[in-house]
Curated annotation (Swiss-Prot):
This is Iron-sulfur cluster insertion protein ErpA. The gene is erpA. It comes from Colwellia psychrerythraea (strain 34H / ATCC BAA-681). Binds 1 iron-sulfur cluster per subunit. Its cofactor is iron-sulfur cluster. It comes from the Bacteria. It holds the Pfam family Fe-S_biosyn. HAMAP family: Fe_S_insert_ErpA. Iron-sulfur cluster binds at residues 41, 105, 107.
Length: 113
C-alpha cells in the first residue's frame, strides 16, 4: 500500500533487498541512504550507501522493517520518484525512476533536470 503523502516511493523489491543485505551484514542499525551528487555524463548522479546515522533534516521512509534515508538537498531532485531494485540479464542494482529527469544516460545512474 502506498502513502500518497510521501514525496518518493520505496518499492517492496528495494526494501526486500535492503533487508537481505542488512541481514547479511548482521547490523540492524544500517539504513539505505540515497543521494544525488554532481557528476556523471548528464550532470547529476545517484548514489546508494549504507549508513547508521540519520542526520537533522533527513527524510526517512520505513518499509518491511528497514529504513531509506534521503538528505534534504538530494530530496529536491527526487520528488515524485521511486527507488527500486531490479534484477535482469544486465545485473542487479538499485535504481531511481525519476520523472523530473529530462535526460538520463544509458546506465541509468546519471541524469539532468
Amino acid at each position: 500500500m502506498s502513502n500518497p503523502e510521501l514525496p518518493i516511493k520505496f518499492t517492496d523489491s528495494a526494501a526486500s533487498k535492503v533487508l537481505s543485505l542488512i541481514t547479511e551484514e548482521e547490523n540492524p542499525a544500517l539504513k539505505l541512504r540515497v543521494y544525488v551528487t554532481g557528476g556523471g555524463c548528464s550532470g547529476f548522479q545517484y548514489g546508494f550507501t549504507f549508513d547508521e546515522k540519520v542526520n537533522d533534516g533527513d527524510m526517512t521512509i520505513e518499509k518491511q522493517g528497514v529504513m531509506m534515508v534521503i538528505d534534504p538537498m538530494s530530496l529536491q531532485y527526487l520528488v515524485d520518484g521511486e527507488v527500486d531494485y531490479l534484477e535482469s540479464l544486465e545485473g542487479s542494482r538499485f535504481v531511481v525512476n525519476n520523472p523530473n529527469a529530462t535526460t538520463t544516460c544509458g546506465c541509468g545512474s546519471s541524469f539532468s533536470i
